[in-house]
From Swiss-Prot:
Record organism: Geobacillus thermodenitrificans (strain NG80-2)
Molecular function terms from GO: DNA binding
Region ranges (Disordered): 1-21
Keywords, ordered alphabetically: Cytoplasm, DNA-binding, Transcription, Transcription regulation
Protein name (record): Probable transcriptional regulatory protein GTNG_2524
Length: 247
């Protein structure tokens, strides 16, 4: 994990999503709908809904869109049955890729994901073929331009709040937590006046793969193709972010 800033990759993803804001809001609405349908429409009593609402707010999703998705899930109208499916495989150069989907048509989604891999130099694998290369973690990113704090001061606050570790780059402080302690750490740091450029539970690669030339171009095209699919919620990979920011 050390030495591999997540902030550049998050910025790249946010910039790409800004260009496709309507699609991003649609995917977030679907995630909110599923969380509310499965666990109820009260965020205080539904941790999954609470987390995705935070994610939606961080993406500047309008409050009325959030409320609409919750009402749709908890109302009396006919409901859509979405199923979460995870695909695992390898991109060009052996980059590990995990794709998280929410779909109401497994056959359509499987065909689209398989096509994205095959057309961009990758291949789908069996369940579990790459998941062992990732670890589920809470990640809180603080933009250093927004907070004039010393690294040691913030590290102490993070540890006292229950964080596991913190990494520092020129642009950001990146605080890692267990999934279980994520909300507690976030709330305690917010009470100290901190705000987050990104706050999510994500999959962190344990090893990284560096690509260049045509392999890198194909890998970036694979990521873009997958993220552009309406059924795909998240794409996790272990491509070294330092090469992404140069593109």
């Amino acid at each position: 994990m050390a030495g591999h800033s997540k902030w550049k990759n998050i910025q790249r993803r946010k910039n790409a999503q800004d260009a496709k804001r309507g699609k991003l809001f649609m995917k977030l609405a679907k995630e909110i709908y599923v969380a509310a349908k499965n666990g109820g429409g009260d965020p205080a009593a539904n941790p999954s809904l609470r987390l995705v609402i935070e994610k939606a707010k961080a993406a500047n999703m309008p409050g009325e869109n959030i409320e609409r998705a919750i009402k749709k899930a908890t109302g009396n109208q006919e409901h859509t049955n979405y199923e979460e499916i995870r695909y695992e495989g390898y991109g060009p150069g052996g980059v590990a890729v995990m794709v998280v989907c929410l779909t109401d048509n497994k056959n359509r989604t499987a065909a689209n994901v398989r096509s994205a891999f095959s057309k961009n130099g990758g291949n789908l694998g069996e369940t579990g073929c790459v998941s062992y290369l990732f670890e589920r973690k809470g990640l809180l990113v603080i933009d250093r331009e927004q907070h004039n704090m010393e690294e040691d001061e913030l590290l102490l606050l993070a540890i006292e709040a229950g964080a596991e570790e913190m990494e520092t780059t020129d642009e950001s402080f990146e605080i890692y937590t267990t999934p279980e302690s994520f909300e507690t750490v976030k709330e305690q740091l917010e009470q100290q006046g901190l705000t987050f450029a990104s706050a999510e539970i994500t999959m962190i690669p344990q090893t990284y793969t560096t690509l260049s030339g045509d392999e890198l171009k194909k890998m970036l095209k694979l990521i873009d193709t997958l993220e552009d699919d309406d059924d795909v919620q998240e794409v996790y990979h272990n491509l070294d972010e330092s090469v992404i920011e140069e593109q």
